[in-house]
């Protein structure tokens, strides 16, 4: 009888060790650090309201307002856990949409060096760079109307002080040499499907030019100048989406 009681107790203890993964939804806000003081005001009692009442986690993540390198910004965080993500876009030239509306493999290259890269035909490649030049190579590895040893003879891909996204035509078998005075990225577009439920909140936004053609207007908002505006709007979008899919009682 004693041994039977011991087995029952052991079974009860074992049952308590079962680990059930958390299914609490997570609402994320990625913001420029000039909003840090405002974000701190909400990171406390306000976040606890939603955690205790709705079992929702509010996660605040910041990036430097002096950095326009979107790849570096989004690679610092695991955004895959976000059920919905709000991004405070500090400057309209920042191409968050390019890297969130599609899946890309990007490689980073050092500045002030010549890089020889082959870009296979039939694939989509683009550069994310500033002050980048390239020289296409012939089948005999000779620069076509450019000298691979002299970067001043290269053809310009991007100019200016902010990062630009530029599609690269894949027309040579032997590839290209690239040179830039700044670090740059070459990216292979794997798919054109968004991998995250995200919304872009522009502080100021001019609906013109190349950027306007790249944006999915269903998730773009303009004139959101404060952290509070972004936070309340993303919460409103989150709860509205839940009401749209959940049956009424």
Curated annotation (Swiss-Prot):
InterPro entries: Rotavirus_VP7, VP7. Its main location: virion. Belongs to the rotavirus VP7 family. This is Outer capsid glycoprotein VP7. Residues 1-15 form the signal peptide. Calcium-binding protein that interacts with rotavirus cell receptors once the initial attachment by VP4 has been achieved. Rotavirus attachment and entry into the host cell probably involves multiple sequential contacts between the outer capsid proteins VP4 and VP7, and the cell receptors. Following entry into the host cell, low intracellular or intravesicular Ca(2+) concentration probably causes the calcium-stabilized VP7 trimers to dissociate from the virion. This step is probably necessary for the membrane-disrupting entry step and the release of VP4, which is locked onto the virion by VP7. The keyword Cell division does not apply. GO terms for cellular component: host cell endoplasmic reticulum lumen; membrane; T=13 icosahedral viral capsid; viral outer capsid. Disulfide bonds: none annotated. Coiled coil: none annotated. Homotrimer; disulfide-linked. 2 Ca(2+) ions bound at each subunit interface in the trimer hold the trimer together. Interacts with the intermediate capsid protein VP6. Interacts with the outer capsid protein VP5*. It is found in: Virion; Host endoplasmic reticulum lumen. It comes from Rotavirus B (isolate RVB/Human/China/ADRV/1982) (RV-B).
